[in-house]
């Protein structure tokens, strides 16, 4: 039986270090279920999902984070978007053959990772780092080193649990109020956390996991937050996109297909617009202009 998708925040009482633990297997399953991705791409999306959930939980404001991988290999794009409510969605775009057991480099080729932080109120921030690490976690380490943010380490695990895909992970971060000497404590905790196995994350209760990892430490565990798949697509958003098309383009599609079928690449939902729908959209467009 799958454990509920949740994010757990915790704090080391004797160190200026905070932590997070997330399990997102059901959300991972939802992201994959409308697509037929090769196994290495499935794994990449699972890793991105865990990373995005953990990073989103570090936000001190309402907003969202998008973590995306782009490159010139067969996997042109892999992206996960999540918000402060831990609502996640994601997709990959593939153009070419992805061989079994492909590495990140073999899938993406020469590329980069973009992390975009978008507050509900405020300016957007975007960080870019070249994909030079062997794994996504390595690339995230590079990102934190280059962006001069608080020392942060992520530990990402994906796999199969009870015949279904599973994804989880942990994050450690030094607090802004950290005193001198915290770096040594942080490194010690990183070494302990690195021993976590996927099977432990997927099957054990959070308190047991923390006890196994940090049985000599005093850990404060906070109330969990639910993690879920949630797509933000809607018929209105599709209509807003159609408004940007010229009448000539719309008429051409109608003559050819009889309607316009718009499919969300995140969740697979189809939105059908016939001639009457499009006429109403045109009227709305004219009203907006006046």
Swiss-Prot record:
| Keyword annotations of the record | Chaperone, Cytoplasm, Disulfide bond, Redox-active center, Zinc
Q: Does the keyword Transferase apply?
A: no
Q: One Pfam family, please name it.
A: HSP33
Q: Per its UniProt record, what SUPFAM superfamilies does this chain match? A: Hsp33 domain, HSP33 redox switch-like
- GO CC terms: cytoplasm
Q: Which Gene3D superfamilies match?
A: helix hairpin bin, Hsp33 domain, HSP33 redox switch-like
Q: Which GO BP annotation is one of this protein's?
A: protein refolding
Matching NCBIfam families, A to Z? PRK00114.1 (NF001033)
Q: Spell out the protein name for this chain.
A: 33 kDa chaperonin
Gene name? Answer: hslO
């Amino acid at each position: 039986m799958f454990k509920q998708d949740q994010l757990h925040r915790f704090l080391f009482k004797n160190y200026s270090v905070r932590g997070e633990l997330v399990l997102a297997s059901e959300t991972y399953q939802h992201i994959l279920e409308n697509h037929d991705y090769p196994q290495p791409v499935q794994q990449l999306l699972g890793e991105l999902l865990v990373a995005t959930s953990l990073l989103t939980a570090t936000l001190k404001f309402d907003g969202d984070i998008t973590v995306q991988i782009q490159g010139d290999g067969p996997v042109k794009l892999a992206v996960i978007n999540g918000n402060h409510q831990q609502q996640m969605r994601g997709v990959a775009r593939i153009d070419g053959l992805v061989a079994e057991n492909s590495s990140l480099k073999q899938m993406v080729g020469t590329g980069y990772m973009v992390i975009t932080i978008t507050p509900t109120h405020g300016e957007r921030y975007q960080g870019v780092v070249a994909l030079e690490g062997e794994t996504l976690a390595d690339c995230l380490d590079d990102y934190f080193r280059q962006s001069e943010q608080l020392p942060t380490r992520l530990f990402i695990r994906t796999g199969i649990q009870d015949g279904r895909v599973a994804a989880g992970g942990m994050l450690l971060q030094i607090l802004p109020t950290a005193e001198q000497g915290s770096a040594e404590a942080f490194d010690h905790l990183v070494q302990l956390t690195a021993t976590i196995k996927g099977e432990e994350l997927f099957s054990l209760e959070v308190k047991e996991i923390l006890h196994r990892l940090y049985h000599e430490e005093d850990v404060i565990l906070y109330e969990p937050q639910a993690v879920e798949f949630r797509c933000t697509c809607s018929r209105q958003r599709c209509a807003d996109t159609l408004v940007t098309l010229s009448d000539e383009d719309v008429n051409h599609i109608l003559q050819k297909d009889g309607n316009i079928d718009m499919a969300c690449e995140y969740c697979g939902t189809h939105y059908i617009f016939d001639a009457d729908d499009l006429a109403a959209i045109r009227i709305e467009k004219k009203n907006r202009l006046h």
